[in-house]
Amino acid sequence: HLFEHLMFGGSLNIPEYDMPLQIAGGENNAFTNNDITNYYLTIPSENIETGFWLESDRMLELDFSQKTLDTQKKVVIEEFNQRYLNQPYGDAILQLRPLAYKKHPYRWPTIGMDISHIEKVDLEQIKKFFFSHYAPNNAIIALTGNITYNTASELAKKWFGPVERRKVLRRNIPSEP
């Protein structure tokens, strides 16, 4: 979940991710679950190339700064507090997961089991995660709206073609007893 937030912190070329998207009439959001992180844009079809540019650029040159990491840690810790600690029975799901799953990664909430998991993350761990998961060969682009397959394919090649393919970490998921 923390990494989802960091993806909106800008890239080396585009320090404010939201600004060019909003100028193009678009908006964005994301969600994370145990299997995927889904980043999505809603943008007028005449500005679709702006979306490709933004997505490929942050996959290519995400800005790994300590300042952004520190800021987003605070945001995610506040989310953790609001969602799990400041609500009656809010932490019930945190207690339930390890009872349901003994070995499987589903035992871990995407936000972390407790605040210390968020606090302990450092910039090197963030970089390692990025370079072992965020690559064109580990991404799915889904488009709907007023765009043809040929146009989508051409734009994907244009904007993601130059992004280096990476050795993607494959999860070895243990079976439950």
Locate the predicted segments by residue.
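Acidic/histidine-enriched alpha-helical segments
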Residues: M19-I23, D63-N81, T148, K167-P177
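M16/insulysin-pitrilysin zinc metalloprotease superfamily fold
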Residues: G10-S11, T42-V75
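An aromatic/glycine/proline-enriched structural segment found at the starts
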Residues: R107, P136, I140-P177
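M16/MPP (pitrilysin/insulinase) zinc-metallopeptidase core fold and M16-derived inactive scaffolds
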Residues: L2-T42, W108-I111
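Extracytoplasmic
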Residues: I23, N34-N38, T71, I93-L96, ...
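Short, solvent-exposed loop/turn segments at the edges of secondary structure
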Residues: E16, L21-I23, N33-I36, D91, ...
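Scaffold signal of the M16-like zinc-metallopeptidase fold and its non-catalytic homologs
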Residues: L6, G10-S11, G51, R83-P136, ...
